[in-house]
């Protein structure tokens, strides 16, 4: 392979990596809230009151893993969906206030965005109360390393 061909290959790989990184975030995404009540349900993804989609794969994870971050359902416009999303983490930002939090994907949804746990995520970034008043927030999210 010539040097020019190698440089073109490296450039193509860098572009692909940049595109993949960009695809792992979204802005102005609708985020509703859901009452998973993880603390009241012993952080049990399979509890009848929770019944999270990801319980099939993640319910047997250690309590320290299940309780490390607040919970969210994910059906956003960018990133993996279904089983491939289970257990991944999102950095969720309320651009209106700058409040941020890391949340773990434990469920799927159908609203085209996020369905944040009320106790562990939504109220933590709805610092001005507008999300509660409107019934939703518009947020930005980015997939991040959970550091598990």
Swiss-Prot record:
SUPFAM superfamilies: Barwin-like endoglucanases. It holds the Pfam family Barwin. The modification Pyrrolidone carboxylic acid is found at residue 24. Residues 24-148 form the Barwin domain. The keyword rRNA-binding does not apply. Keywords: Antimicrobial, Disulfide bond, Fungicide, Hypersensitive response, Pathogenesis-related protein, Plant defense, Pyrrolidone carboxylic acid, Signal. Disulfide bonds join 54-86, 75-109, 89-146. Residues 1-23 form the signal peptide. One of its GO terms (biological process) is killing of cells of another organism. It comes from the Eukaryota. One of its GO terms (molecular function) is RNA nuclease activity. Monomer. Shows antifungal activity towards B.cinerea and towards the wheat-specific pathogenic fungi F.culmorum and F.graminearum (groups 1 and 2). PANTHER family: WHEATWIN-2, WOUND-INDUCED PROTEIN WIN2. This is Wheatwin-2. The gene is PR4B.
């Amino acid at each position: 392979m010539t040097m020019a061909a190698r440089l073109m290959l490296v450039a193509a790989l860098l572009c692909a990596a940049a595109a993949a990184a960009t695809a792992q975030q979204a802005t102005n995404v609708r985020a509703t809230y859901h009452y998973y009540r993880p603390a009241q349900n012993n952080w049990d993804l399979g509890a009848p009151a929770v019944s999270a989609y990801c319980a099939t794969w993640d319910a047997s994870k250690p309590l320290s893993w299940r309780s490390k971050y607040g919970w969210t359902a994910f059906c956003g416009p960018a990133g993996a969906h279904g089983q491939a999303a289970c257990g991944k983490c999102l950095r969720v930002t309320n651009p209106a206030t700058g409040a941020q939090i890391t949340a773990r994907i434990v469920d799927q949804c159908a609203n085209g965005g996020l369905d944040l746990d009320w106790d562990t995520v939504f109220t933590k970034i709805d610092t001005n109360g507008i999300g509660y008043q409107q019934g939703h927030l518009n947020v930005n999210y980015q997939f991040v390393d959970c550091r598990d």
